Amino acid sequence: KIKELENDKKSKEVNILKSINKNIPLSLLNEIEDYINKLRTSTTNLSKKEYIFQNSIGDLMSHEKDLINNIFTDLQSHLILCEKNTGTWSVENINDIVLGQRKPYDFINLEEGIPIMCTENNNELGISNGDIGVLIGKNENRKFLFRKFNDNNDLVVDFIEPSTLNNVVPAIAITIHKSQGSESEKVSILWTQKSQINKYKEDLEDESKLMFFRDSYEKRLLYTAITRAKSFLDIYFLN
């Protein structure tokens, strides 16, 4: 599929960047920095209006709709996708570099504008597995900001106390698997040559079939990642 994209002269919005270095490409780290700075600006524009943290505020969208829409537009402007959570070119690899932290993450002291993801359904709070939000506010005003549907199926935003939602991870980058159902104007994919062998390989006696399963898995995974992009796509390929 990568060769197809490279040979497609019409794909002006697609960039294939090969690397032999196991370090995260510097060009991508610079883009991540720009992305987080943009989010930090839009979240700070909202959080500096301290009245928004009052319990009596009610529907936040009715007060600061434009600022909130800016945050979620910025949040959805770039999606960084990895094949895996750990190892070379992984989600945790990026978190390590960008945040300087490993699990468990200190969400109270991280800077505003860091994207976050809920990893388990929480029916009481109305947050689902895979929902992406952002850190907002400082110190006693630190909150998780999520957009969700209320009981009337209306789209609303909600401040959530970090202490009430435990299953949260940074979402600077996410796995391709977790990205299913998401879209972004720009997608950057970190892709390695090492194949993930299908878990049913022990049932296959014919080696050619084993290779077919492995390639088929990779093809589906890469297809899922590529189709998250609405306008621009960068594929970083570890060769």
Which stretches of residues belong to each language-model region?
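C-terminal accessory regions
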Residues: 131-139, 144-239
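Glycine-centered loop/turn motifs
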Residues: 113, 129-132
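Low-complexity, intrinsically disordered or weakly predicted helical/coil tracts enriched
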Residues: 62-63, 79, 118, 123, ...
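Conserved helicase motor core of P-loop NTPases
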Residues: 1-125
